[in-house]
Amino acid sequence: MSKFQHDVMLRIVKILNVLMIELPFAACWFLYYSHQTYANLAWEGHFAILGLFFILYIALGKIYDAFWMSMQRVSELVYGQILGAMATDGILYTVICLMSAKFCNLLPGIAAIVGQLVMAAIWASCAHKWYYKTFPPQKTAVVYDVRHGMEKLINEYGLSQKYDVQVTLSVSECLADLSILDGMETVFVSGVHSHERNIILKHCVGKGINMFVIPRVGDVIMSGAWPMHMFHLPMLRVGRYMASPEFLFVKRTMDIVISLVALVILSPVLLITAIAVKSDGGPAFYKQVRLTKDGKQFEILKFRSMRVDAEKDGVVRLSTGDKDDRITKVGHIIRACRLDELPQLLNILKGDLSVVGPRPERPEIAAQYCEEMPEFALRLQAKAGLTGYAQVYGKYNTTPYDKLQMDLMYIAHPSLIEDLKIMLATVKILFMPESTEGVSEGQTTAMSGENH
């Protein structure tokens, strides 16, 4: 099967998903909500409503990985589709209320969500089986300089059905005989220096082999380079993070609006949580010095989730998740729901934090990391954030170096659209246990200072 045929088949299956998810909404619209509007809509109006759902669901579904059947488990596909569907339903419900000049009954909408859940489960199960039956595992090679455990990761994430690792070899073995890669469909390259990697890259491109590279920090920085001409030569301009004044103004305006609206809407939750945390006789809030842009220090505000004497000896200890006996009963609950982070909305309003950015680190932990890897200081090019690229796409126990690269990927490509994607994608990880896993004894992470 050619790549073109492969892509066409995938698009047809994905469009089928969109139509299946839209079907319950369409039934809900025609049977109930269309009769609530103050104007009788012609067929063009109905088409516009259904078309809006179609477009919004595709956009939101991509953010939540709702269509990525080759890289997601069935449960993850269903989860992503329901998040995308609920977000789309919410937007359309708002539009319908505006068209009706009143708050409409939510029950038909809830019924539509139940129908969408059923449709998502049917599609995800069938599409997952269809994909792996139609497309056999790709012949895969792993080339390494420093082992990255790529084979283990492929198996751990359930991707052995997609990538059949047939060859694992060192970069020296690969360069000695590049023909070893011939016949492979995919090559993963891990920890290989740029000069050697470029030789492998040229060979793979020439042979039509897909190549995945686990980058180094320099690669991530280069990814944000600005292509240009100078002296009749192609050049790449690389420099320190320098967002435009217009971008920073809009980003700050968004921070203020989002934090204000969130504080108003969530005020009952904040009050109840504060009372619950104080029930053990300790303070409701916990303050800790953190670093933000250009190394500026500020006090981050969180709901206290550990005992008051959690660090009475002055030693910073890693949180080991649910097994950490320093976490209070209320602390376990608010951590699981991320409620302990909500007071940081005040830090955002004050200007210490942004909604999206690298997570702020403790000065002593940052100093330790900078000794081990000086590039860690590059995170301070941008203002710290409540959520970020590393939080959405990494895990609590992702290594500091990997989180650093994720943060630098965000910094290299400043974009309000990317900020919006990260905000929406943050919703997806709120109820995913692996994103709050603790760390094992002796393991350090870029978040290891966040004990409270």
Predicted regions located by residue number:
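Short, glycine-rich, amphipathic interfacial segments at transmembrane boundaries or analogous
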Residues: 218-219, 286-326, 386-405
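Signature of alpha-helical transmembrane segments in polytopic membrane proteins
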Residues: 1-132, 452
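C-terminal terminal-structure detector
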Residues: 375-452
